[in-house]
Amino acid sequence: CNACADVCPKNCITFKTDIEGFWYPVVDKDACINCHLCEKVCPIISPADKVIRYEEPRVFAAYTKDEEIRTDSTSGGIHSMLALAVYEKNAYVGGAVYNEDHTVSQIIDDDPVRLPEIRSSKYLQSDSTGVYREIKKKLLEGCEVFFCGCPCQVQALYKSLGNKEYE
């Protein structure tokens, strides 16, 4: 999820790709100050502090009535409709985009022109480096942010915010 690199005060974490194409963090031990922030934010090393359990399963189903958005989307267009509502409030939307080099990155932007890039599922690992830091900055400035990512990325964002809940 790359959250460890975002919270590292010494920027001493890089990522190496294994034979299967997955990224693994590499710590420059000479630069590391052993603050352990990387471990605290890691959803693997430090699992969720609280688990929300419901008595009954909570299931929702929906899709947009906007046929063009629904056709261009992979999940009924609900993400796009939520994002448009966020943009109308001059807030920020975060999500995955394809890059020119055929990789995928997480971004945060307040320009609705970027929505078609964010729309749709991306079936490969996305680079989140920098996005958690940027989201935290925007939240501290009082901005609203709508972030969409994989479960591990959402958990990493929550942990990088110090497990603080924002409305």
PLM features: residue spans?
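Iron-sulfur cluster-binding cysteine motifs and their immediate structural context
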Residues: 3-26, 36-54
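Glycine-centered flexibility sites
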Residues: 1-4, 34-38, 76-77, 149
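Short, charged amphipathic alpha-helical surface segments
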Residues: 30-31
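Iron-sulfur-associated redox domains of electron-transfer enzymes in respiratory
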Residues: 46-167
